[in-house]
Swiss-Prot record:
PANTHER family: ALDEHYDE DEHYDROGENASE-RELATED (PTHR11699)
Any GO MF annotation of the entry: aldehyde dehydrogenase (NAD+) activity
UniProt keywords, alphabetically: Cytoplasm, NAD, Oxidoreductase
Catalytic activity, reaction form: 4-(trimethylamino)butanal + NAD(+) + H2O = 4-(trimethylamino)butanoate + NADH + 2 H(+); an aldehyde + NAD(+) + H2O = a carboxylate + NADH + 2 H(+)
Protein name: 4-trimethylaminobutyraldehyde dehydrogenase
Stated family: Belongs to the aldehyde dehydrogenase family.
Residues reported to bind NAD(+): 189, 241-245, 400
PROSITE patterns per the UniProt record, alphabetical: ALDEHYDE_DEHYDR_CYS (PS00070), ALDEHYDE_DEHYDR_GLU (PS00687)
Length: 503
């Protein structure tokens, strides 16, 4: 809380985090049995923000034990009692929203405008599931002869969350809120690149009144995540991240037959038809590619534009992309900050170089950028990039770049573009811009993706389910559907008469 309270006077390049970043048993704890210390960098300056010490096996076990003990109390509470505590947590986040958002910016690199939206989305998620908690119930089924059955919706136990670095606080809330609403306990592991804000969420839940040890945080990388996946007392793992890591999580969790939710990568198509409202389509394409420096799993990075409107579309998109203000993420006029790390920046720039080799044309951006402010000279900035002259077989069109790079491709017919849009192993999101209501719903029905946007893009309301098709994962986050992934159904069969026996 002291770190959060100091945020009003904080500026880019001024914050050093010395607090312990693990949390179990209702308090912050310093790692002792992790292998090595890893530096955590501030994306805007390239400066070391803090040191992350990963948790080892003994510490992960302590966190799980803490969760197990609290689960015995929380799972016995009525839904309305759980709801009151969760609503108080949402209120505290709302109250501290501005300060948490500033710390999120310093750790993650996204702009303050986006971070404020993320923190709002976090408390809204908790508030939503607080409302859902008292409604969770089973079903009564009448059977012949006066017998009957009923179902009980019961929690799973200890749920583990393995988080991504692009939305550290919000994704932590997405994992915790439905789990807690259903009566579970939680142990989550933030990304080693963004370890700072997740622990604040755990503190807030305890301040709000959850049983001590209900929400726990273990820091670390792949080894710590592996310990959670293999732990015999973890009932479920929810993972957000890349496809290769998701496969490993699934494989490790299978050894103890855990419930698994995977929210993985994407290479989402955005289809822009000639009858669209061009202004909205341009706005949608920019939102689909440049939020959070392009580091968003749902990004519509394959922008298919009907040939007749390609010149007008490119002219407007390039003009607006060039006008994007890149710089200090804590300034309200900034629209793009630094990428998460130097390796990520180099990787994205490498994709642009490869695209040029394969014949794509860079219409703007795609280069390292040094803002005028001297304190930002070592930050991980690049200019947002628009590529045209792209083909479906190019690396930039097939692989997830995870940076501010838009690939634009022409198409002629609806049938053709649907076939091309679905020709991918991913299936997280998709979008269509058209004024033809029949086409809009026809295209949405035929796109192979967990989410399809019609005449919009890049919104994820907590009320609606979110998740992927194909290799973008399975399970759902947000919405009522998530209850099915954080609970289990018990069937109880009751005979009111004599037992009908063959013996």
């Amino acid at each position: 809380a002291q770190l959060v309270d100091s945020m009003p006077s904080a500026s880019t390049g001024s914050v050093v985090v010395t607090d312990d970043l693990n949390y179990w048993g209702g308090r912050r704890i310093k790692s002792k049995d992790g292998a090595t210390t890893e530096p955590v960098f501030e994306p805007a300056t390239g400066r070391v923000l803090c040191q992350m010490v990963p948790c080892g096996a003994e510490e992960v076990d302590q966190a799980v034990q803490s969760a197990q003990a609290a689960y015995l109390k929380w799972s016995k509470m009525a839904g309305i009692e759980r709801s009151r505590v969760m609503l108080e947590a949402a209120r505290i986040i709302r109250e501290r929203r501005d300060n948490i958002a500033k710390l999120e910016v310093i750790n993650n690199g996204k702009t303050i405008t986006e971070a404020e939206y993320d923190i709002d989305a976090a408390w809204q998620c908790i508030e939503y599931y607080a409302g859902l908690a008292p409604t969770l119930s089973g079903q009564h089924i009448q059977l012949p002869g006066g017998a009957f059955a009923y179902t009980r919706r019961e929690p799973l136990g200890v749920c583990a969350g393995i988080l991504a670095w692009n939305y550290p606080f919000m994704i932590a809330a997405w994992k915790c809120a439905p789990a807690l609403a259903c009566g579970n306990a939680v142990v989550f592991k933030p990304s080693p690149m963004t370890p700072v804000t997740g622990v604040i969420l755990a503190e807030i839940f305890h301040e709000a009144g959850v049983p001590v040890g209900l929400v726990n945080v273990v820091q670390g990388g792949a080894e710590t995540g592996s310990l959670l996946c293999h732990h015999p007392n973890v009932a479920k793992v929810s993972f957000t991240g890349s496809v290769p890591t998701g496969k490993k999580v699934m494989e490790m969790s299978a050894k103890t037959v855990k419930h698994v939710t995977l929210e993985l990568g994407g290479k989402s198509p955005l289809l822009i038809f000639k009858d669209c409202e061009l202004e909205n389509a341009v706005r949608g394409a920019l939102m689909a590619n440049f939020l959070t420096q392009g580091q968003v799993c749902t990004n519509g990075t394959r922008v298919f534009v009907q040939r007749e409107i390609m010149p007008q579309f490119l002219e407007e998109v390039v003009k607006r992309t060039k006008a994007i203000v890149v710089g200090d993420p804590l300034l309200t006029e900034t629209r793009m900050g630094g990428l998460i790390s130097k390796p990520q920046l180099d990787k994205v720039l490498g994709f642009v170089a490869q695209a040029k080799k394969e014949g794509a044309r860079v219409l703007c951006g795609g280069e390292p950028l040094t803002p005028s402010d001297p304190k930002l000279k070592n930050g991980y900035f690049m200019s947002p990039c628009v590529l045209d002259n792209c083909r479906d077989d190019m690396t930039c069109v097939k692989e997830e770049i995870f940076g501010p790079v838009m690939s634009v491709l022409p198409f002629d017919t609806e049938e053709e573009v649907l076939q091309r849009a679905n020709n991918t192993t991913f299936g997280l999101a998709s979008g269509v811009f058209t004024r033809d209501i029949s086409r809009a719903h026809r295209v949405a029905a035929n796109l192979e993706a967990g989410t399809c946007y019609i005449n919009t893009y890049s919104i994820s309301p907590v009320e609606v389910p979110f998740g992927g098709y194909k290799m973008s994962g399975f399970g759902r986050e947000n919405g009522q559907a998530t209850v099915d992934y954080y609970s289990q159904l018990k069937t109880v069969i009751v005979e009111m008469g004599d037992v009908d026996s063959l013996f």
